[in-house]
Amino acid sequence: MNGSSGQYTRGHQSEQVGSDADPAPNAQEGRFTSAEEVAEAELDVISEQGPVQPSHPWTRYVALGDSFTEGIGDPDETRPGYHRGWADRVAEALAEGTQNFAYANLAIRGRLIGQIRDEQIAPALELRPDLITLCAGGNDVIRPGGDPDETARTLDTMVQLLSTTGATIMLFNGPDVRETPVVGSIRGKVAIFNENVRTVAARHDAVVADMWSLRELTRPEMWDEDRLHFSPLGHHTIARMALETLNVGHNLEPLEPRPVPERSWREARVDDVVWARHHLFPWVARRLRGRSSGDGITPKRPNIEPLFGGSMPPGGGSIEES
């Protein structure tokens, strides 16, 4: 990175996962992943190279899902309460050089696949999109007793409805959790769900953004300190992959953070205990009480509105009044 922080350097594309509850592999302190630093690095590239003006057919983009698509883990410090995330980056890239491009994001943190179906599909259809991204089911699969086949059947009905728009539909599969000590045991369930996602995509002529194969996401720097959401760097990396899946040119170069300092086994276990106390146990407690991090949250971009480069209208994730 050429900015003042010096936290990032530009890397090369290395080997080629997201839901509210996809914990990170061994996330630690010392990740150089602040939203401000990543945004500064992205602006450096644009100022040096000029904006890429890609050629693509889309003018109305609607993003659906949970916290992954809302952008949790990537707060926008210029707009309190707003989270940028990979979908905003994709919209920004698509808007460059595209007259009358408009974007809506209906995703809400904590949503299960049935809630996404019931709350987001009908509004999405009313917005008449020509590009739809959908990531749903991760929160269902990770739960004890979660059935990847039943979850995929719900996904299939959702994609069938969305396909009536004639829009390009991009689905996301889940991450490889092999390196994750907390949920590594459900790797098989995630793999089954991922194969089901591919089957659904093939049935409805959708494309798949392959997070399982995005090996960079096994690095702790790609994750927020809660180990449940992606960091700004993670969202940046996923946006690059999504744009390349759509075969769209962009300015999102690989960013290479400084390595995380090595820690002793004892230090790592202390961090695990602190993480469990502050993040894992509260997450479990909410589920036991039937609560969600998304209770009372509204979509950050409920209307399909224009983008002007990287700027966006005010809004995002407000709390509903009782």
Functional labels for PLM-detected ranges:
Residues 179-212, 232-235:
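Substrate-gating cap/lid alpha-helix
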Residues 2-109, 121-128:
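Serine-esterase "nucleophile elbow" of acetyl-processing enzymes
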Residues 75-81, 146-149, 184-188, 224-225:
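Short glycine-enriched, charge-decorated loop/helix-capping segments at active-site entrances
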Residues 164-169, 206:
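A short helix->loop->beta-strand "cap" motif at the edges of active sites that frequently abuts
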